[in-house]
Each structure stands twice: as C-alpha cells, then as structure tokens.
Design a protein with these regions (language model features):
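Sequence contexts marking disulfide-bonded cysteines in secreted/extracellular proteins
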Residues: 22-24, 31-33, 40-45
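A conserved cap/lid and substrate-binding interface adjacent to the catalytic center
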Residues: 39-137, 154-159
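Short glycine-enriched nucleophile-adjacent loop
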Residues: 147-155
Length: 159
C-alpha cells in the first residue's frame, strides 16, 4: 500500500511514528465513513471532528478539524468503485494549470469532481476553527488527489 501524506503548515517536523500512524488511520477512515454522525469505525480517532463528506461522480473526501495536529484536514480514499478505476486508467497527461506541470487526466478529473465543494468547505472551516494549518492525506488514487489539492492550495493561497 502506498500512502501519501502531505502537510501544509509553516513549521517542519522531524519523523514521528505516532503522527504517521495517525495519518494512516485518517486515510483509512475515509473507506468506512458514510455520514458525519458515523465517526465510529475501527480506525476513526477521537481527536478528529468530522465536518464534511464530499462526494460527486464516484470521488470522495472527508474534511474537518484534527485536534491531534491542531489543523484542518482533508483525506481522500483510494479506488473503491468502478468510476474510480475508469479514472485510474486515463493516463494521458494534461496541463490544466497552463504551465509545465502535467497531471494524469483521470487523477485530475477525479479531484476536479469535488474540488469546488472542498475549497468552499475549507474556507468555512478556516473561519470556524481560526486556523490556516492544513493536513492533506490520501491512499492510492487519494494520494494523487491529495498531491493535486496541495498544488491547488499553494497556488490559490500562496501566503
């Protein structure tokens, strides 16, 4: 299993095994959560306040506040339905940002299905929790979507 963990904060951290396990659990929990009231699966942690589940055209992410890192979070699952697998095989590269960055078309499409709602939610969460710290994590396809979102966030909010 490949797990991509990205964190966007102003500080850098040394390797912390507990932090890595926390992020793995956060990524894993995206597979079992179906509503914001159901934060009770085996890998769901009490330090997490789940606020949003964003789904569209087979793409999914969960968003909320993480007391463990004192940050907002976005977590993406890996491929879990036929639509995801169709996106996975769309490997031709595109340049949606009008620069030299190339992204596999399927990964970008999967991310783009839920991008707008996630950005709106992040704006609301930033105000609610009074923080601009953000943890972005994902597994497999979700790792690709987490990487794209990181690029988007850094370009949308360069400060």
């Amino acid at each position: 299993m490949i797990l991509l963990i990205l964190i966007i904060i102003s500080l850098s951290y040394a390797y912390d095994e507990n932090f890595v396990k926390h992020c793995v659990n956060l990524a894993q929990s995206t597979y079992c959560v179906t509503s914001t009231e159901e934060w009770n699966c085996k890998t769901c942690e009490s330090s997490i306040k789940l606020e949003y589940i964003v789904e569209n055209s087979g793409s999914k992410a969960i968003q909320g506040f993480d007391k463990y890192t004192n940050s907002l979070f976005v977590s993406f699952p890996g491929s879990s339905n036929l639509h995801n697998w169709i996106e996975n095989i769309q490997v031709n590269k595109i340049s949606p940002y009008n620069n030299s960055v190339e992204i596999e078309k399927g990964f970008y499409k999967a991310y783009n299905f839920i991008k707008k709602d996630m950005i709106i939610n992040l704006s609301l969460l930033t105000k609610k929790y009074n923080t601009n710290k953000l943890l972005i994590t994902g597994h497999s396809l979700g790792g690709a979507m987490a990487t794209i979102m990181t690029y988007d966030i850094l370009n949308l909010f360069p400060e």
